[in-house]
Amino acid sequence: MCTGVRFSDDEGNTYFGRNLDWSFSYGETILVTPRGYHYDTVFGAGGKAKPNAVIGVGVVMADRPMYFDCANEHGLAIAGLNFPGYASFVHEPVEGTENVATFEFPLWVARNFDSVDEVEEALRNVTLVSQIVPGQQESLLHWFIGDGKRSIVVEQMADGMHVHHDDVDVLTNQPTFDFHMENLRNYMCVSNEMAEPTSWGKASLTAWGAGVGMHGIPGDVSSPSRFVRVAYTNAHYPQQNDEAANVSRLFHTLGSVQMVDGMAKMGDGQFERTLFTSGYSSKTNTYYMNTYDDPAIRSYAMADYDMDSSELISVAR
């Protein structure tokens, strides 16, 4: 399971991050794909003549960078989140469309587009084709894509591709995005305000303290509950002005829905936990990351690497 969040500062800079929740690590690390790095897309999907530099969290499999989440120097970011039971992809390319393998979709987006507007326009003629990396299972995902202005959710299901405008700038897992947005209506009465004294009959009632207005916000770690909680937190967090404060906001917001070892078993009996939290700031083109066992937040600035290199860069944590 996973959670994603996006917001911007008063200068329009992107802050985008995610939790990756699972029972084991894939050996993920910070990967930098410079502008000069060349790779062939599986089905020949086109792109920029001069592609963007990309930084994010992922693994190298079959000699390819495969990103869980990533961003480019223009402030466009993308993350794949688990979506089993709903995600449905074709297994062969469709003639007359731009065919993109599911595992290369994050890199293809970040490498070739500068904004959500550009991505949304391109998706009108894109087919997402399921391709399984040798030794791995099919990835059943939906995607959260954001920039300094807005975010969208891309869900490929049996009835086709759905591109949703995400007005709360968060995403979790299944059910569908439409369900999550409808479910928010159950929580319209919650508030971050201090509850006013009231009377019931002859009894005068006062709040115990701060937080009473939040009564009803779910505390479990299921996908619908995390969506509600992170949407509430993202909507009510005070606007911040500088990089450090916004990175703190990003990690605290995602911390409100982190999964702790022992809280929730998966079907195989293993406990799910937040393996890592990652985030990106377009203000400084810096990726941030911490892990379950090392909560110190590490920073990885694009400026520290040769963004015109022809070599893929894997950064040891």
From Swiss-Prot:
Pfam families: CBAH
Keyword Lipid metabolism: yes
This protein's record includes keyword Lyase: no
Domain of life of the native organism: Bacteria
Outcome reported for the amino acid change (mutating residue 268 to A): Decrease in both hydrolase and acyltransferase activities
Pathway: Lipid metabolism; bile acid biosynthesis
Effect of residue 18 to A: Loss of both hydrolase and acyltransferase activities
Induction: Up-regulated in the presence of a mixture of unconjugated bile acids cholate (CA) and deoxycholate (DCA).
UniProt keywords, alphabetically: Hydrolase, Lipid metabolism, Transferase
UniProt-annotated binding residues for taurine: 82
Active site: 2 (nucleophile)
Positions contributing to deoxycholate binding: 2, 18
EC number, UniProt record: 2.3.1.-, 3.5.1.74, 3.5.1.24, 3.5.1.-
Annotated Gene3D superfamilies: Penicillin V Acylase, Chain A
Catalytic activity: glycocholate + H2O = cholate + glycine; glycodeoxycholate + H2O = deoxycholate + glycine; chenodeoxycholate + glycine = glycochenodeoxycholate + H2O; cholate + taurine = taurocholate + H2O
Subunit text: Homotetramer. The tetramer consists of a dimer of dimers.
Protein name: Bile salt hydrolase/transferase
Species, as recorded: Bifidobacterium longum subsp. longum (strain ATCC 15707 / DSM 20219 / JCM 1217 / NCTC 11818 / E194b)
Gene name of the record: bsh
